[in-house]
């Protein structure tokens, strides 16, 4: 395994005995792994994301490059992106994770929900701008993106008339769905999400790769990261497969130690959507049959000044997973004071914000551990396109193992359909 890319530290997990845990779980992990590869898990055909790293991506990358060149030739300055669920969270995650290297001269506007204020704000911002519209939906029938796509497609048509098709990209199923029909009827550029890839596992489908390219990042590097992760995670050995080990420890903390909540923590606001992606992967895959951890998150050190008291001295119904990204793309050293050290910070002179943040991470872990909080620490080698691809694939693999240990179908989300059914019934009846 590439230990230098991602390491898992369990030294702050109370009661963890490697020998006992490995003996208890190894055979279960071996069986689930075999069933996963043999497509024997429930909805076991939904493994397109796992097959993706080994596939030939030349045609997709060529098409993405062509779209990028076309938008540049049209002098597009603004992208309106319409999507929800994994089709939104994943895109926001990759762009935020790599934001320090984002190209200038292009702005993205997300329209992910039913907020009239958000839609109106975007409409106001893109007025008189050269803009394009991208949407992701396999069926084309999910209400929130369908409504927003209508609103913004109409605006695009009013602005550009019979040439509006040049500025539309739909990312959808190869053969089925309303967006496929629209693309055929109006000449929209279409990228395909394979039918065996679910939304929360689709970040590195054409949607994520296209947006990464448009904003100056390297899709090839992202894909190389996924391929390396897949190579590293071929083994079922808990000694060498950190994704499976993470899944096992989560399961043990939930079933044996009786924790109900996992608080996933990062130390930079840029990683908020990375934590949201963690929440969706585990929450949507495991939240079934009244048997699951409740995944939530905090951004430190900001949340230490609101939730820190609870984490330190509140009831210990939770454990923490800390994601520490090393070698960030941006750093600042504390400069000498122009005001004769009246802020009394000269003892930190020439230290960087990242160095100080590292001290904060170590100090918080020590403080929380002393307060009987169990803490899993995941350390990522760097902030890069390659590392993002690696970690997203790693999380997806961990999700499958973790949910399968609970006996769940990790690829469906039947509970989401309940509100949709009720909502459509009310809307169609005039409520």
Swiss-Prot record:
GO terms for molecular function: carbohydrate derivative binding; glucose-6-phosphate isomerase activity; monosaccharide binding. It catalyses: alpha-D-glucose 6-phosphate = beta-D-fructose 6-phosphate. It is found in: Cytoplasm. Coiled coil: none annotated. The keyword Chloroplast does not apply. Its EC number is 5.3.1.9. Pfam families: PGI (PF00342). GO terms for biological process: gluconeogenesis; glucose 6-phosphate metabolic process; glycolytic process. The keyword Cell membrane does not apply. One of its GO terms (cellular component) is cytosol. Pathway: Carbohydrate biosynthesis; gluconeogenesis; Carbohydrate degradation; glycolysis; D-glyceraldehyde 3-phosphate and glycerone phosphate from D-glucose: step 2/4. The active site is at 284 (proton donor), 305, 420. Keywords: Cytoplasm, Gluconeogenesis, Glycolysis, Isomerase. Catalyzes the reversible isomerization of glucose-6-phosphate to fructose-6-phosphate. Belongs to the GPI family. This is Glucose-6-phosphate isomerase.
């Amino acid at each position: 395994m590439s230990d230098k890319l991602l390491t898992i530290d369990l030294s702050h997990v109370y009661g963890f005995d490697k020998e006992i845990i490995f003996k208890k779980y190894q055979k279960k992990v071996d069986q689930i792994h075999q069933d996963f590869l043999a497509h024997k898990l429930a909805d076991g055909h939904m493994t397109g994301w796992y097959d993706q790293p080994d596939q030939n991506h030349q045609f997709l990358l060529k098409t993405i490059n062509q779209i990028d060149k076309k938008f540049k030739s049209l002098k597009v300055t603004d992208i309106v992106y319409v999507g929800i669920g994994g089709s939104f969270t994943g895109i926001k995650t990759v762009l935020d994770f790599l934001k320090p290297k984002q190209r200038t001269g292009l702005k993205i506007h997300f329209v992910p929900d039913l907020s009239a204020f958000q839609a109106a704000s975007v409409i106001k911002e893109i007025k008189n701008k050269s803009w394009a519209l991208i949407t992701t939906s396999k069926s084309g029938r999910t209400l929130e993106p369908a409504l927003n796509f209508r609103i913004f497609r109409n605006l695009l048509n009013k602005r550009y008339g019979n040439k509006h098709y040049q500025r539309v990209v739909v990312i959808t199923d190869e053969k089925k769905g309303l967006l496929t029909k629209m693309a055929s009827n109006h000449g929209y550029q279409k990228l395909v999400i394979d039918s065996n890839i679910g939304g929360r596992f689709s970040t590195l489908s054409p949607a994520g790769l296209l947006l990464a390219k448009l904003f100056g990042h390297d899709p090839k590097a992202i894909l190389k990261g996924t391929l390396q992760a897949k190579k590293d995670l071929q083994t079922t050995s808990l000694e060498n497969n950190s994704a499976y080990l993470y899944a096992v420890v989560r399961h043990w903390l939930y079933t044996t130690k009786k924790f109900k909540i996992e608080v996933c923590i990062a130390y930079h606001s840029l990683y908020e959507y990375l934590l949201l992606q963690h929440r969706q992967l585990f929450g949507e895959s495991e939240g079934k049959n009244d048997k699951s951890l409740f995944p939530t998150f905090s951004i430190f050190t900001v949340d230490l000044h609101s939730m820190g008291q609870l984490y330190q001295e509140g009831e210990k119904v939770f454990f923490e997973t800390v994601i520490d990204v090393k070698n960030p793309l941006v750093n600042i050293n504390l400069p000498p004071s122009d005001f004769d050290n009246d802020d009394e910070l000269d003892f930190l002179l020439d230290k960087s914000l990242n160095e100080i943040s590292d001290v904060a991470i170590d100090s918080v872990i020590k403080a929380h551990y002393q307060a009987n909080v169990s803490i899993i620490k995941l350390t990522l080698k760097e902030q890069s396109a390659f590392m993002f691809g690696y970690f997203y694939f790693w999380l997806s693999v961990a999700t499958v193992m973790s949910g399968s240990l609970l006996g769940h179908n990790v690829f469906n989300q039947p509970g989401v359909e309940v509100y949709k059914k009720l909502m459509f019934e009310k809307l169609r009846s005039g409520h």
